[in-house]
Amino acid sequence: MSENTRKVTVAVIGSGNIGTDLMIKVIRHSDVLQMGAMVGIDPDSDGLARARRLGVPTTAVGVHGLLELPNFDEIDVVFDATSAKAHAANAALLEPLGKRLIDLTPAALGPFVVPAVNLDEHRHAANVNMVTCGGQATIPIVAAVSRVTPVAYAEIVASIASKSAGPGTRANIDEFTETTSHAIETVGGARRGKAIIVLNPADPPLIMRDTVLCLISARDPATHDAIRNSIQAMVEHVATYVPGYRLKQQVQITPVPDGQPVHTLLASGDTAAPTHQVSVFLEVEGAAHYLPAYAGNLDIMTSAAVRYAESVADTIAAPAATQGATR
């Protein structure tokens, strides 16, 4: 960001775990973004209390309160960390007013963005969707495999600490699986995708763990090596904005046993039987900016959202000198 470009002013709707972590990331770690408002519906929420202590304008009456804030016109980008249902209503109010929306719910009204895979494809979109925590963790791996060889079927299992799943996450379980499955195909490149989420009740809580299984038709050892290299490169890429993202163990590529009914998993019309399964085991440790380190599932969502917002800042923030000349 050049010295002549102003910072991008953002608002966060949702004063729960995700929204509060977003605010902390913007205030403490972004040279490009600045907080303009924190929006909630519970005046006693910790997120709103923290925002007030940090000098961030707040409202406890939802998006309508955001519209009434004196600095509303200065806000460029709105992060929505509410719920899929609430996002539809929020978007209907904010999009006509020219606000760029970054949706952290499974609503999926706009195109999917997974920064490690398609960061530059939707730079001017009015509303983008950050898929889900499981999608942000696993879709890069599916994409890494599909860049080397076609993926007939990809299945992901995201295991998150039950304590990290707030009411919004729990209310959106069905939307989580549907949205993630769709994004595995459209962003990850799999012919067919499936997503499963597990709320792990272990105490003390365990960090986020993800399993990615891809069915491929590739017998050549050189192709297998290329897949491993592609996955390793992708893990390193994601770790540039989510430092706690890592492989739990070595990538496994094993033959599909004879007689295994994998044809039941294939997309309609696909007849070629996959020859091998790629198995990838990941863990995501949170940065603990606001949330505990075990909440890597939430940290990867907020980190991805901030990464996207920073990457498109140049499409939003006009040079300060130009602004002054046009007033």
UniProtKB/Swiss-Prot annotation:
| Assigned EC number | 1.2.1.10
Biological process GO annotation list? catabolic process
SMART domains named among the record's database cross-references: Semialdhyde_dh
Catalytic reaction list:
acetaldehyde + NAD(+) + CoA = acetyl-CoA + NADH + H(+)
Q: Which Gene3D superfamilies match?
A: Dihydrodipicolinate Reductase, domain 2, NAD(P)-binding Rossmann-like Domain
Q: Quick one: which residues bind NAD(+)?
A: 15-18, 164-172, 297
Q: Which UniProt keywords apply?
A: Aromatic hydrocarbons catabolism, NAD, Oxidoreductase, Plasmid
Give yes or no: UniProt keyword rRNA-binding: no
Named from the GO MF annotations, one term is: acetaldehyde dehydrogenase (acetylating) activity
InterPro entries in the record:
Acetaldehyde_dehydrogenase, Acetylaldehyde_DH_C, NAD(P)-bd_dom_sf, Semialdehyde_DH_NAD-bd
Q: What is annotated as the active site? A: 133
EC category: oxidoreductase
Q: Which family is this protein grouped under?
A: Belongs to the acetaldehyde dehydrogenase family.
List the protein's name.
Answer: Acetaldehyde dehydrogenase 6
Recite the lineage of the species.
Bacteria, Bacillati, Actinomycetota, Actinomycetes, Mycobacteriales
